[in-house]
Amino acid sequence: MGISRDSMHKRRATGGKQKAWRKKRKYELGRQPANTKLSSNKTVRRVRVRGGNVKWRALRLDTGNYSWGSEAVTRKTRILDVVYNASNNELVRTQTLVKSAIVQVDAAPFKQWYLTHYGVDIGRKKKAPAAKKDAEGQDAEATTEEAKKSNHVVRKLEKRQQGRTLDAHIEEQFGSGRLLACISSRPGQCGRADGYILEGKELEFYMKKLQRKKGKGASA
């Protein structure tokens, strides 16, 4: 028995009479879910659908294009982990990529962009006193590198600095090298796992959810 989307085989809750039986039709078929897994062995299948159109069924993915809305920048980055799914915990346990799943993505491409755009290296950890001396030597190298920048570039960076704002939660995440993001594409339909970085109220909401989940896990 294939998966069928017709209502012929369903009984009426009211006890009403069923339609006259007929065979299944091609346009009533259903396909099993893609259940796209997080894996470095990227696998995308081509599916021919109604009207001769094509869908791309992603079976395994580990990268996607993620946009940082407040900075209006998009970068291709690695998906590191699936951490939350509002509909099903099983999809988190099995690391399944679906639309609206909350994932952790690699912060490196965004960190690099931020450094070139604003001249600010975000997410650097505070140094211990012993490590400070080594850091001073590195800072001296950095200053010589900074001296290489032309006056025009320096002026441009200073101008950008004036309107710069960075959410404390996002800065904290840059420190760990992982950013919380939401998948907004449908991997089983278009073969991609693209999305956006969580910010503001939405980020706070999901951070609370994850904290609560962590608390439950510790108490169990």
Curated annotation (Swiss-Prot):
Belongs to the eukaryotic ribosomal protein eS8 family. The lineage of its organism: Eukaryota, Viridiplantae, Streptophyta, Embryophyta, Tracheophyta. CDD domains: Ribosomal_S8e_like (cd11380). Transmembrane segments: none annotated. Pfam families: Ribosomal_S8e. Disulfide bonds: none annotated. Keywords: Ribonucleoprotein, Ribosomal protein. InterPro entries: Ribosomal_eS8, Ribosomal_eS8_CS, Ribosomal_protein_eS8_euk, Ribosomal_Se8/biogenesis_NSA2. GO terms for cellular component: cytosolic small ribosomal subunit. Residues 1-41, 131-151 are annotated as: Disordered. This is Small ribosomal subunit protein eS8.
